[in-house]
């Protein structure tokens, strides 16, 4: 699933081609993704794209006729091409075409993403309920420690909760907990202030590094220029079940926590008794 670094990579990849451009047409080939594609999108001819931004895993196109919320879902990706350069494929569900002939193409084999119109993205219910951005100054050790009090949930599920902090998906949660030397099943309420300092620090480091690497390609995700994300080449625990830990040589284990596969080193990430 594309996570925060993949969406940030997509934003940076498409922004130079779309910022300031006028929408000629939005072609919708599939009316139902995770939710129904907003009808308003097909009536945005002449709208100017005045800015692009990201909130959590949502890419937002701010236009003179409202905002477009895009989510990549489980398997989505965005590509930039010239109009009439390449016929749409089976999984190419939406094309945003600009007056100068650029095409933003949305591909999603599993059809679990979304394209929604809203008057103001900041006031949309999908956005207003979100926690702080992990790379922002508001995501601090003091904040995380305060939110963790009386939380019996596993720390891995805790940091993946978008009400607590956005964009820390499964891959980056596993990697961050490894770097912080925290077992994924440790109860959030048992985190110390020092552990929260370390965890916040490594979450920021892991996500920043992943963005530099263009995200993580495990199956479907590709960057707008067609290249894969290279962070997969430096994963320490995620997807490495039965392989040796790079730090201590202990065999990496996997366990389902919160309905997701979790990867950890039982030696580097010991669960306190």
Curated annotation (Swiss-Prot):
Q: Give the GO terms filed under biological process for this record.
A: base-excision repair
Q: List the catalysed reactions.
A: Hydrolysis of DNA containing ring-opened 7-methylguanine residues, releasing 2,6-diamino-4-hydroxy-5-(N-methyl)formamidopyrimidine; 2'-deoxyribonucleotide-(2'-deoxyribose 5'-phosphate)-2'-deoxyribonucleotide-DNA = a 3'-end 2'-deoxyribonucleotide-(2,3-dehydro-2,3-deoxyribose 5'-phosphate)-DNA + a 5'-end 5'-phospho-2'-deoxyribonucleoside-DNA + H(+)
Give me the residues that bind DNA, please.
91, 110, 151
Name the InterPro entries for this protein.
DNA_glyclase/AP_lyase_DNA-bd, DNA_glyclase_Znf_dom_DNA_BS, Formamido-pyr_DNA_Glyclase, FPG_cat, MutM-like_N-ter, Ribosomal_uS13-like_H2TH, Znf_DNA_glyclase/AP_lyase, Znf_FPG/IleRS
**Which UniProt keywords are present, listed alphabetically?**
DNA damage, DNA repair, DNA-binding, Glycosidase, Hydrolase, Lyase, Metal-binding, Multifunctional enzyme, Zinc, Zinc-finger
Q: What is its EC number?
A: 3.2.2.23, 4.2.99.18
Reply yes or no: does the keyword Oxidoreductase apply.
Answer: no
Chain intervals annotated as zinc finger (FPG-type):
236-270
The record's free-text note on cofactor binding: Binds 1 zinc ion per subunit.
Q: Domain of life, per the record?
A: Bacteria
Say what the protein does.
Involved in base excision repair of DNA damaged by oxidation or by mutagenic agents. Acts as a DNA glycosylase that recognizes and removes damaged bases. Has a preference for oxidized purines, such as 7,8-dihydro-8-oxoguanine (8-oxoG). Has AP (apurinic/apyrimidinic) lyase activity and introduces nicks in the DNA strand. Cleaves the DNA backbone by beta-delta elimination to generate a single-strand break at the site of the removed base with both 3'- and 5'-phosphates.
Q: What is this protein called?
A: Formamidopyrimidine-DNA glycosylase
Question: Origin organism of this chain?
Answer: Actinobacillus pleuropneumoniae serotype 5b (strain L20)
Q: Which gene encodes it?
A: mutM
């Amino acid at each position: 699933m594309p996570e925060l670094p993949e969406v940030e990579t997509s934003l940076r990849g498409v922004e130079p081609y779309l910022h300031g451009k006028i929408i000629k047409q939005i072609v919708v080939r599939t009316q139902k993704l995770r939710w129904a594609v907003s009808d308003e999108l097909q009536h945005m001819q002449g709208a100017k794209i005045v800015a692009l931004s990201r909130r959590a895993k949502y890419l937002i196109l701010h236009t003179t006729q409202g905002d477009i919320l895009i989510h990549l879902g489980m398997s989505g990706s965005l590509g930039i091409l010239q109009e009439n350069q390449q016929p749409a494929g089976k999984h190419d569900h939406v094309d945003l075409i600009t007056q100068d002939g650029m095409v933003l193409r949305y591909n999603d084999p599993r059809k679990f993403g979304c394209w929604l119109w809203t008057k103001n993205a900041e006031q949309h219910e999908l956005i207003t309920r979100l926690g702080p951005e992990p790379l922002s100054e508001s995501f601090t050790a003091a904040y995380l420690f305060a939110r963790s009090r009386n939380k019996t949930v596993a720390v891995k599920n805790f940091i993946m909760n978008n009400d607590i902090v956005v964009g820390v998906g499964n891959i980056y949660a596993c990697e961050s907990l490894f770097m912080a030397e925290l077992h994924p099943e440790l109860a959030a309420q048992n985190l110390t202030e020092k552990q929260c300092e370390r965890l916040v620090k490594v979450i920021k480091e892991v996500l920043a590094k992943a963005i530099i690497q263009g995200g993580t390609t495990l199956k479907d995700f590709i960057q707008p220029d067609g290249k894969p994300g290279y962070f997969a080449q430096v994963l320490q625990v995620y997807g490495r079940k039965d392989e040796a830990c790079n730090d201590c040589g202990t065999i990496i284990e996997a366990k389902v926590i919160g309905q997701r596969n979790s990867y950890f080193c039982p030696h580097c990430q010991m669960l306190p008794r």
